[in-house]
Amino acid sequence: MAGSSGQQGKGRRVQPQWSPPAGTQPCRLHLYNSLTRNKEVFIPQDGKKVTWYCCGPTVYDASHMGHARSYISFDILRRVLKDYFKFDVFYCMNITDIDDKIIKRARQNHLFEQYLEKRPEAAQLLEDVQAALKPFSVKLNETTDPDKKQMLERIQHEVQLATEPLEKAVQSRLTGEEVNSCVEVLLEEAKDLLSDWLDSTLGSDVTDNSIFSKLPKFWEGEFHRDMEALNVLPPDVLTRVSEYVPEIVNFVQKIVDNGYGYVSDGSVYFDTAKFASSEKHSYGKLVPEAVGDQKALQEGEGDLSISADRLSEKRSPNDFALWKASKPGEPSWPCPWGKGRPGWHIECSAMAGTLLGASMDIHGGGFDLRFPHHDNELAQSEAYFENDCWVRYFLHTGHLTITGCKMSKSLKNFITIKDALKKHSARQLRLAFLMHSWKDTLDYSSNTMESALQYEKFLNEFFLNVKDILRAPVDITGQFEKWGEEEAELNKNFYDKKTAIHEALCDNVDTRTVMEEMRALVSQCNLYMAARKAMRKRPNRALLENIALYLTHMLKIFGAIEEESSLGFPVGGSGTSLNLESTVMPYLQVLSEFREGVRKIAREQKVPEVLQLSDALRDDILPELGVRFEDPEGLPTVVKLVDRNTLLKEREEKRQVEEEKRKKKEEAARRKQEQEAAKLAKMKIPPSEMFLSETDKYSKFDENGLPTHDAEGKELSKGQAKKVKKLFEAQEKLYKEYLQMPQNGSFQ
């Protein structure tokens, strides 16, 4: 034994060598970078922290679907980076509340309000409109842009139409209500025309800075309400140009000190030639082919900054304003160069530079901002920081068209966010955006929205069906069921789809592919549930719940499902917060079972009135409460909580279909009745009389009433005689049937 023991000690067993699996290279996030026009691996500068600046709106009018295109798309990208890829995103957005458009619109609104307060007489109004039409006509003739020309022509036409009734009323010396009504119509139609004219003549007299702050403050509030309604997350920090004027002045001064800016007549301009000639810098990084495009550059400078005297202040036409000397009728702030206001491009540079420093990870904006706005932002910021990497990744969202056309007020396809939300929910709009690439053109049309509505309905039905399965009572161990081949196959498909979705998100956040993969996964689940139902077997609860939870999680990440956030611990401990479904469903289940019992008795006892009441509960009462009862043949009632408006819409569509069927049935019955009446009327005619009234065809008849001569007195040919004989015999048969009808009771 001792020897044996020693043997064991000598040959002691040890664990075999272990080798890690080869594995696969993890998929990395790539983003389409406008600086390279390629998809690049996304590598933040500081670990998982991501600094992100997004160009916000210029707030002088209602937000429209073009704004929604950018802000919903960036909201989706931000959520995916934060909640899916788990980056620590610091998101900054600006509000442009000092701008040429704002100044002009504020002055126009103020002057038009003053004009209305004076209550101009009809004759004076007509005189003013004619005066305003003169410069307007010159502007119309000089306009070459077809969309803008169409808009101006429409304004001119509508003003002329509104002018005529008032001119006639004045000529006829009408007074009172009739004239006042014509005045109101003309004031409404000529508002833009008169506002522009008043601004050109009196705009320089507007000096109160509060007039220029009132307008953007109002529209900023409307913008935030629109974003909240669209479920767009608010930025981590919001910057307003009006609150950063001192920082902008300092930013401009340093650019001048670094040799890239120059002062001219109280304004400060960026020296593009000096910057481009520097070995450290490049001008026009985003759209180099657009450098020198004077039309684009002038649009970037603003309507109030492209007069001949302004343009003459520049060393080069390619230079752009960092600071503008204020003219009479423009707001102003003190600075080393005299009273003035910021240029458009410098505003973003100063605010983003103040908060995010010399280099940010992501800068975002709409596609049409690439040049000159973003190229000029890059230039002046890199001139300030003396670097070549102010932005690492530039993301630009695609255009939005309206039913294939460029969005334009002149084409009457300018849709505000509020108007869009009257037709479709925020979720439906977001689903439409998710079903398209964020960087490509999106066509906002009835077809696009119908696809989104169908997708929403498709997913919702799946979630409702899974909820119904999960509500089926089981004991605590019964919720874990043995898997068969069908469950194993569905689970494999589930993990395959998760991989495909991850790869799509890594590929420039390709939500379009993600949505298709999710649709395919739901289709596989539907086939599985249908097969189990056909076999009278219960689907696997845990598997379907896992898939439904995953899909819900993804939709929450995309912002398609809202989550209520709360601070701190829930009141009353965990699990006590109100959940409508878990609270209401037990009561609905009791109601459903009671209704089933009542229906069973009503069918057995043949009480149709009770069955009708039961159907009315299902079809008329419960939908008003957002509850759907489904009565599948031979199976228990399925209870679903659905959005009330969705159910009411479904009910209305069902009623319309039924009404259409009823109308078609009535129409068919009416046609049948008319045909029978016509047939009866024909049957009543004795064959001997059937041709006698046709004097336009025949002139002579035999003793039986058969025609022998045509209308011109010529004897009928053999063929014609044979034809009328055949008609005569057919009528003879019909008349015979008619005479027999009272005897056999066919007609009463």
Swiss-Prot record:
- Name the domain of life this protein comes from: Eukaryota
In this chain, ATP is annotated as bound at 409
Q: Which Pfam families match?
A: tRNA-synt_1e
* PTM-bearing positions, type Phosphoserine: 19, 305, 307, 746
Please tell me which stretches of this chain the record labels as motif 'HIGH' region: 57-67
The annotated regions of Basic and acidic residues compositional bias extend over: 654-679, 700-717
| Disulphide linkage map | none
Molecular function via GO: ATP binding; cysteine-tRNA ligase activity; metal ion binding; tRNA binding
Q: Which reaction does it catalyse?
A: tRNA(Cys) + L-cysteine + ATP = L-cysteinyl-tRNA(Cys) + AMP + diphosphate
Record PTM N-acetylalanine, positions in chain: 2
> Motif 'KMSKS' region residues?
406-410
Outline the subunit composition. Homodimer.
What GO CC terms are in its UniProt record?
Answer: cytoplasm
Which positions does UniProt annotate for L-cysteine binding? 56, 96, 373
| Stated name of the protein | Cysteine--tRNA ligase, cytoplasmic
Species of origin: Macaca fascicularis
For this chain's record, the cofactor binding note is: Binds 1 zinc ion per subunit.
* Any single biological process term in GO: cysteinyl-tRNA aminoacylation
